[in-house]
């Protein structure tokens, strides 16, 4: 099959979250299955120097009242074809935000549609999050191109329909209050990035006011778990790790722990229980829970905590204050550093993910791969990937809690600290975590099944009367509804 992935990110060149990992790492696994897979992304400023880009465009056109050109490049690691949409609107390296964000990504979706119609025509056009949400709408009446829409994070839903109507051509048949809703209605298949998240978003608690619509389309909705690149993330070969190790040789891991402690200003003592966190510092990731339990944990146990990331100012300030109050025991680096993140995965004893919601999560997969035992809230993809530790039966791969409450998180932390003191059983727990297999090849087989299922098929137009029931979401203010 000819498959084109359209997205705002593609790792490692352009990456903010998990979407970048999916778009960057899924194509090689699909190519191994015999498919012609290519990616199209905006031509952000730095890409022109990072990649070897064709001198001449492969396609020129006009859309939304402005000219654009598409250039061909190759992925720097996997060597598959990447198309860059060239236009001055993408010249900066800013991916998200800004006053023109809605226009920027609607234009990208429109340019991608023109390219797919008139240059390289795929059988399946795989769209990712609201940034490409208009593509399934425009492709709806093209019988030769089937569309798949992946929900990475339902919270971000794109511009409202009235704004889209001002910016660009909206088909007469279009329904859905905003880009995300329209994409889900008109895509031929929809998937979330884990089976549990696919179920959760059909409920009021996690549906972001789209639960009614998601139940309406549930027949074409499924969950496919993300994976990781096992070659790129291999503690036995990772060039960044000072000490390489494997599931059969964990002794070297202690050296990484000591170096991590030194680099982050913690007391260098491998006997201390070291908790790591690599995350965007936002409410979704449960950083506020960490702020609420850290003082009590540090008072009761001899634990150390190392945090790496950036995010909301008030959360950064809270973490910084803890570092000032507990020197040598609590450390935070308010930046993102790939080398340091790998050292946290490969040197910490346990890894923190107390998320409010988690569509899939990549960090817990990396942590387990590198022998850092995950401590997670049982939500979204964390349910599908982390098995609760059961000391009586010597089973499980991490520590789990259910409610988003400080006491529940704290209890899991203390349980893990107590387990850490029993070195033999802790090493068995580490090895069970490291033995889990979350490769992209497994995920690619599921995507291939979905592509084959949808190839050459167009879903019927949505029932207008049914769609109107979900307009503006079940929890929205009815007074906002347009006539």
Swiss-Prot record:
Its BP terms in the Gene Ontology are: glycogen biosynthetic process
Alphabetical list of InterPro entries matching this protein: Glyco_trans_1 (IPR001296), GS/SS (IPR011835), Starch_synth_cat_dom (IPR013534)
Q: Which reaction does it catalyse?
A: [(1->4)-alpha-D-glucosyl](n) + ADP-alpha-D-glucose = [(1->4)-alpha-D-glucosyl](n+1) + ADP + H(+)
Pathway-wise, it operates in: Glycan biosynthesis; glycogen biosynthesis
Class in the EC hierarchy, top level: transferase
Matching entries from SUPFAM superfamilies are given as:
UDP-Glycosyltransferase/glycogen phosphorylase
Any GO MF annotation of the entry: alpha-1,4-glucan glucosyltransferase (UDP-glucose donor) activity
Identify the residues that bind ADP-alpha-D-glucose: 15
| Keywords recorded for this protein, A-Z | Glycogen biosynthesis, Glycosyltransferase, Transferase
Record-linked NCBIfam families: glgA, PRK00654.1-3
Q: What family is it from?
A: Belongs to the glycosyltransferase 1 family. Bacterial/plant glycogen synthase subfamily.
The record describes the protein's role as: Synthesizes alpha-1,4-glucan chains using ADP-glucose.
What is the protein name stated in its UniProt record? Glycogen synthase
Q: Which organism is it from?
A: Prochlorococcus marinus (strain MIT 9312)
């Amino acid at each position: 099959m000819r498959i084109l992935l359209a997205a705002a990110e593609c790792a490692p060149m352009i990456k903010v979250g998990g979407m970048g990992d999916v778009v960057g790492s899924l194509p090689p696994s699909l190519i191994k299955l015999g498919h012609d897979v290519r990616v199209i992304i905006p031509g952000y400023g730095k890409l022109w120097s990072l990649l070897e880009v064709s001198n001449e465009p492969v396609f020129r056109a006009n859309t939304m009242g402005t000219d654009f050109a598409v250039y061909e490049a190759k992925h720097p690691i996997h060597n598959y074809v990447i198309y860059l949409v060239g236009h001055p609107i993408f010249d900066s390296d800013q991916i998200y935000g800004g006053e023109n964000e809605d226009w920027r990504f609607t234009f990208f979706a429109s340019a991608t549609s023109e390219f797919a119609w008139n240059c390289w025509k795929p059988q399946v056009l795989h769209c990712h999050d609201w940034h490409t949400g208009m593509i399934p709408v425009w492709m709806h009446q093209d019988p030769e191109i089937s569309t798949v829409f992946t929900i990475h994070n339902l919270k971000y839903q794109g511009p409202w329909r009235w704004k889209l109507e001002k910016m660009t051509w909206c088909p007469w048949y279009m329904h859905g209050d905003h880009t995300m809703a329209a994409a889900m209605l008109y895509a031929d298949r929809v998937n979330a990035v884990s089976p549990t998240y696919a179920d959760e978003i059909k409920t009021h608690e996690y549906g972001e006011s789209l639960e009614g619509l998601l139940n309406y389309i549930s027949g074409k909705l499924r969950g496919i778990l993300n994976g990781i690149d096992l070659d790129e993330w291999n503690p036995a070969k990772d060039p960044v790790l000072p000490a390489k190790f494997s599931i059969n040789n964990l002794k070297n891991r202690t050296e990484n722990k000591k170096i991590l402690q030194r680099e982050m200003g913690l007391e260098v003592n491998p006997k201390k229980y070291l908790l790591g966190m690599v995350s965007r510092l936002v409410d979704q990731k449960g950083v506020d829970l960490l702020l609420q339990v850290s003082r009590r944990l540090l008072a009761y146990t001899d634990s150390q905590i190392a945090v790496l990331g950036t995010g909301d100012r008030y959360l950064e300030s809270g973490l910084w204050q803890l570092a000032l109050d507990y020197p040598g025991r609590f450390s935070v680096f308010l930046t993102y550093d790939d080398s340091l993140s790998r050292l946290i995965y490969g040197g910490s004893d346990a890894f923190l993910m107390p998320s409010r919601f988690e569509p899939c999560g990549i960090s817990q997969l990396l942590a387990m791969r590198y022998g850092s035992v995950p401590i997670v809230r049982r939500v979204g993809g964390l349910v599908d990937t982390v098995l609760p530790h059961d000391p009586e039966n010597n089973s499980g791969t991490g520590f789990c809690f259910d409610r988003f409450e400080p006491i529940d998180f704290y209890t899991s932390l203390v349980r893990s600290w107590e387990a850490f003191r029993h070195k033999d059983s802790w090493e068995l727990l580490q090895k069970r975590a490291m033995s889990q297999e979350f490769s992209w090849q497994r995920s690619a087989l599921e995507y291939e099944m979905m592509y084959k299922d949808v190839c050459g098929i167009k879903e019927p137009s949505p029932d207008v009367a049914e769609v109107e029931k979900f307009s503006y979401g079940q929890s929205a203010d009815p007074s906002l509804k347009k006539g």
